[in-house]
Amino acid sequence: MDVAEENSEEALLIKQQRKEKKEVQAKIQCMKNSVPKNDKKRRKQMTEDIAKLEAEVEARHKEELEALAQKPTEPTQVSSITNGVTSLDLGSEEPVQQPRVSKAQKRREKKAAQEKERDDRIAEAEIANLSGARHLESQKLAQILAERELQIRQIPSDGHCMYRAIEHQLNEQGNSLTVANLRSQTADYMQKRAEDFLPFLTNSSTGDMYTQEEFQKYCTDIVNTPAWGGQLELRALSHILKTPIEVIQAESLPIVIGEEYSNKPITLVYMRHAYGLGEHYNSVEQLDTSTENS
């Protein structure tokens, strides 16, 4: 290509577009570096922004070339086109560098560093936990359940765990009772038989037995909040369902509530050290031996 061809409008425009594409790619790389990998929401938005930016640049470059092909070649046109292209603020050094020095970018980087530090602490805690109470408890429970050809069925730790575990087992038996149903029936049963439950409920501040008002609130909370359920609620549910409820524990023998009933027992797993949040209930299911047999 001679000097004249190199300085033609088309050659200059193509050269300028190539430069612009490189600058856009630099900006895209900067955008990628500015968003933490574990921030899925922002990375999804970033991916959409990048795709939109690339599509806009590609479309505009095509329009510029088509427009150039339809116009007579004049020296002033080259200046007009190239000036218009260079004036576009897509990949200049200032926008590329700006995210690294802006206050917003610094806040994002600080947040990303804090999230990384938190993830590192969680990872360290998980490693330490391999010899901790939670791991030992899980191992012991797995051994106890395996002897019955059962395994733990994980239940979310959201305050409803006991009710969800019972719901799971009832559903396995074809019973469609929900957590809401179980909570409502539990509260109703306890309210109608307050004398059977009041002696076991005390005010944590005074140590005194619940008043009628406190007991009423306790029952209302069972229905309207994710209040954690315990042995009193299990006793009520055993009578409601006319079914024994067996609670397996790692550190002591199983507890059976409602032994007077002959229906197939509901089996729960009580975990004292689960999730670092304290007491928790899981359900059980048949042991999956497919991995061992494969």
Swiss-Prot record:
Protein function: Deubiquitinating enzyme that may play a role in the ubiquitin-dependent regulation of different cellular processes.
Species, as recorded: Xenopus laevis (African clawed frog)
InterPro entries, A to Z: OTU_dom, OTU_OTUD6, Papain-like_cys_pep_sf, Peptidase_C85-like
PANTHER family given in the database record: DEUBIQUITINASE OTUD6B (PTHR12419:SF10), OTU DOMAIN CONTAINING PROTEIN (PTHR12419)
UniProt cross-references to PROSITE patterns, sorted A to Z: OTU (PS50802)
Region (Variable-loop): 222-232
Source species, domain of life: Eukaryota
Sorted UniProt keywords: Hydrolase, Protease, Thiol protease, Ubl conjugation pathway
Principal EC category: hydrolase
Bias kind Basic and acidic residues: ranges: 111-120
Region named Cys-loop: 155-161
OTU domain sequence ranges: 150-287
Family annotation (Gene3D superfamilies): 3.90.70.80
Keyword Hydrolase listed: yes
Regions that span the bilayer: none
Active site (catalytic residues): D158, C161 (nucleophile), H280
Pfam families: OTU
Residue numbers spanned by region His-loop: 270-280
Record flagged with keyword Transcription: no
GO molecular function: cysteine-type deubiquitinase activity
CDD domains per the UniProt record, alphabetical: OTU_OTUD6 (cd22761)
Enzyme Commission number(s) of this protein: 3.4.19.12
Region feature (Disordered): 85-120
Protein's UniProt name: Deubiquitinase OTUD6B
